[in-house]
Amino acid sequence: MSHEGEEELLDYSDSEEIALPSTTVESGSNGDAKAETTTVKEENTEQKGSYVGIHSTGFRDFLLKPELLRAIVDCGFEHPSEVQQVCIPQSILGTDVLCQAKAGVGKTAVFVLSTLQQLEPVPGECSVVVLCHTRELAYQIMNEYARFSKYLPDVKTAVFYGGSPIQKDIELIQNKETSPHVIVATPGRLHALVRDKHLRLGNVKTFVIDECDKVLDQIDMRRDVQEIFRVTPRQKQVMMFSATLSQEIRPICKKFMSSPLEILVDDEGKLTLHGLQQYYVDVEEKSKNRKLGDLLDNLEFNQVIIFVKSTSRANGLSQVLNANGFPCTAVHSGIPQEERIARYKEFKEFKKRICVSTDVFGRGIDIERINLAINYDLPAEADQYLHRVGRAGRFGTKGLAISFVSTPEDKEVLAKIQERFEVNIAPYPAEGVDPSTYMNS
């Protein structure tokens, strides 16, 4: 990488929010009903396929539909993760579930498999609603439904989000041949469809919110969720999932539920992303580009995601990288929706190996080839660090996370991360890192 002029990137504020701090689950209740809390420690694990398995438990033990088991085999999954072992047996029985588990342990598969297991498709009736906070995550969840419903040809799934023509959504809903049984959506667009009487949700049996803390923390989104929730039947299953749940958000989640099973996988106070190597680099702001180029030149990686703190810095850094022989794409909230989805697909399909992003890509996005995450700008809060570095080393695979530390504020955040998650983040070694420690063989 050439380094003509070590220019600092211009910085303008970005509107994306940071995750709230969170705490571990002690107990829970909903009115007078006592809610059960299950804590799972990650012990006696063994590496199996793409998930970390415990003992010899397999997906067949859940007595899933043969069509689902075939799809699971096609995906190459042998053993369920900890969160799947605890959640799936309860969720397929219709139990309300509030689940907090760290990034990369297969939470999405829990609600996808459990809703497909329970689904008996009726033409023209929506049975499952899944809400999430970004278009990219909605698109990804829809793809997970497509993967696991591969051998369930009668099941129809649709994704609705703002920024695309609403008339296309209306036409899809009104056509009985395409009317979905499973709807994945962002709250604003789904509320608009419900409000204007284009969509009826009187037959919904399962209501899911992924990254529920992010959805319910934002007042506008929470209001949309409440309006959607009101038009669904009183008797239904409600499931919510996230990597972080604060003391403030947890009771809000439980207002939507009836005696939920609360599940906490491992000690949320510890950052135990197995196989993820974590380092930091002391570097002046003006030298970040040079250091980043050195890392990209010298490190082996499949795909890398580079996090910055604003849309303007994402644009600026991607231009610098492309100009210096590192083809990359940028994903952030300032890009029109259709273009964002196109860039996400381009990266997921391995057409680009480098992605520069704001925190819009910091939650829930699952791209299996990512094994390197770089915090060009450290997040302002410790919890967002967990979501960011969780993009690498998912599902028990290896990965590497490197954070640039440039200011006194960065040093404070780094200290908070290490204290918050009881993890030691060491200086990046001068001799580099052995690829075998973060590259899967």
UniProtKB/Swiss-Prot annotation:
**Name this polypeptide is given:** ATP-dependent RNA helicase SUB2
List the source organism.
Yarrowia lipolytica (strain CLIB 122 / E 150)
Q: Which domain of life is it from?
A: Eukaryota
Q: Which reaction does it catalyse?
A: ATP + H2O = ADP + phosphate + H(+)
What stretch of residues is annotated with the motif DECD box?
Answer: 210-213
**Which is one GO molecular function term here?**
ATP binding
Composition bias, Polar residues: 21-30
Comment text on domains: The Q motif is unique to and characteristic of the DEAD box family of RNA helicases and controls ATP binding and hydrolysis.
| Presence of the UniProt keyword ATP-binding in the record | yes
* EC class name: hydrolase
GO biological process annotation, one example: subtelomeric heterochromatin formation
Please state the Enzyme Commission number of this protein. Answer: 3.6.4.13
The UniProt keyword set, sorted, is: ATP-binding, Helicase, Hydrolase, mRNA processing, mRNA splicing, mRNA transport, Nucleotide-binding, Nucleus, RNA-binding, Spliceosome, Transport
Localization, per the record, is:
Nucleus
Q: Which GO terms describe its cellular component?
A: chromosome, telomeric region; spliceosomal complex; transcription export complex
Q: The Helicase C-terminal domain covers which part of the protein?
A: 275-436
Residue span of motif Q motif? 57-85
Q: Where is each Helicase ATP-binding domain found?
A: 88-263
Ranges annotated as biased composition (Basic and acidic residues): 33-46
